Design a protein with these regions (language model features):
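AAA+ P-loop NTPase nucleotide-binding core of proteostasis motors
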Residues: 1-405
Length: 405
């Protein structure tokens, strides 16, 4: 009964008690002691009722009280410092020990690259590496569409908790000598001085990041001098004289150096059947020769790991197709409340017809969009598939079919 009393009810009781005080005082002044006693007894009952109501109200407030937990504090600190919550709440050793398995969920067919990156990251984080230098620096080479950028994204999510921790720098924007000012900021007196540098400002605001320098061979040689300082000293000084530290970053550079040799290799003499390993070794040798021609020795020597990615095999393509369908199924579940699955026949058809081993996984990704997603969109618009349905995508009689269960 008393639990249902509101704050207004309690306030009314306080007013009634004050009124009783005035009544008792009046009776005593007029020497009406009997009336004063009766009034005091009624007041005592109301006081008892009032105290019980206050106690019930206090207990209710304690029960409903908002409590600040460790996770709440972690969220606030993460918002202030840009350090991911994962890094604050999960022990780093746990993340580092399972780094390979985390990366393998997203990157297919690049065991050597994943292993090398994981080892280098572990070396950097346990304190064996210079604490002022970046956690790790890598140069990713190899054919297009084999997972160089995907590994960078997976690394950002695994180490720093989110793909948003990836800072992507397109090096084709730094082809001119004066474009160095875009990276670290314009000198005083020049246009854009107040804005700061594109790279230096991003790192200053997001110190825990994976920095991806895409197509690094396109950058002007003067830009490499800035990168040399980052790789060597772990910091740069921007145009305003502020020191920007890279010690909590992972630096990844990708290059298409030797791409033409990968797509159209030159074989002298008679054609000889090569094993997969021989083919990779020959490709790696050609790519590294091109790298030594394009980049200065002092730049190459400062990079922790140079990795030439393997071309994808049929088994890799099948795994990638499964991964693409898993992503599509997750999107359908989240956005449309549709449970989507794909038959083995459909996956095999896509790999058989659309897999291009020289162009990597991208043609396969386009095929899933054009063959499956377009057909699914038509089914949704026609009303044959609705929210909440369980749908199985298959391949029969030369076309994609959807069975609603």
């Amino acid at each position: 009964m008393h639990d249902k009393l509101t704050a207004n009810d309690i306030k009314k009781m306080q007013e009634e008690l004050a009124a009783y005080d005035r009544k008792v005082e009046g009776f005593l002044k007029n020497r009406e002691f009997d009336q004063a006693g009766i009034c005091r007894a009624e007041q005592e009952k109301l006081i008892h009722k009032y105290e019980k109501a206050c106690e019930a109200n206090r207990k209710k407030q304690e029960k409903d009280e908002l409590k600040v937990t460790e996770n709440d504090i972690a969220e606030v600190v993460a918002a202030w410092t840009k350090i991911p919550v994962k890094k604050l709440t999960e022990t780093e050793s746990e993340r580092l020990m399972k780094l390979e398995s985390i990366l393998h969920k997203r990157v297919i067919g690049q065991d050597a690259a994943v292993s090398a990156v994981s080892k280098a990251i572990r070396r950097g984080r346990v304190g064996l590496q210079d604490p002022e230098k970046p956690i790790g620096s890598f140069l990713f080479l190899g054919p297009t569409g084999v997972g160089k950028t995907e590994l960078s994204k997976a690394l950002a999510e695994a180490i720093f908790g989110s793909e948003n921790a990836l800072i992507r720098v397109d090096m084709s924007e730094y082809m001119e000598g004066h474009s160095v000012s875009k990276m670290i900021g314009s000198p005083p007196g020049y246009v854009g001085f107040e804005a700061g540098g594109q790279l230096s400002e991003k790192i200053r605001k997001n110190p825990y990041s994976v920095v991806l320098f895409d197509e690094i061979e396109k950058a002007h040689p003067d830009v490499f001098n800035v990168l040399l300082q980052v790789l060597d000293d772990g910091h740069i000084t921007d145009s305003k004289g502020r020191k920007v530290s890279f010690k909590n970053t992972v630096l990844i550079m990708t290059s298409n150096a030797g791409a033409q040799r990968i797509i159209a290799p030159k074989n002298l003499g008679f054609g000889v059947a090569e094993t997969e390993k021989q083919n990779y070794d020959r490709m790696k040798e050609g790519v590294m020769e091109e790298v030594r021609r394009l980049f200065k020795p002092e730049f190459i020597n400062r990079i922790d790991e140079i990795m030439v990615f393997h071309p994808l095999t049929r088994v890799d393509m099948e795994k990638i197709t499964t991964l693409l369908f898993h992503e599509l199924s997750a999107r359908c579940e989240k956005q449309l409340s549709i449970h989507l699955s794909a038959s083995r026949a459909l996956k095999e058809h896509l790999v058989e017809k659309y897999a291009d081993y020289k162009m990597g996984a991208r043609p396969l990704k386009r095929a899933v969009q054009q063959v499956v997603e377009d057909a699914l969109a038509e089914e949704l618009l026609s009303g044959r598939i609705k929210a909440g349905d369980t749908v199985s995508a298959g391949y029969r009689k030369g076309k994609v079919v959807f069975d609603v269960k």
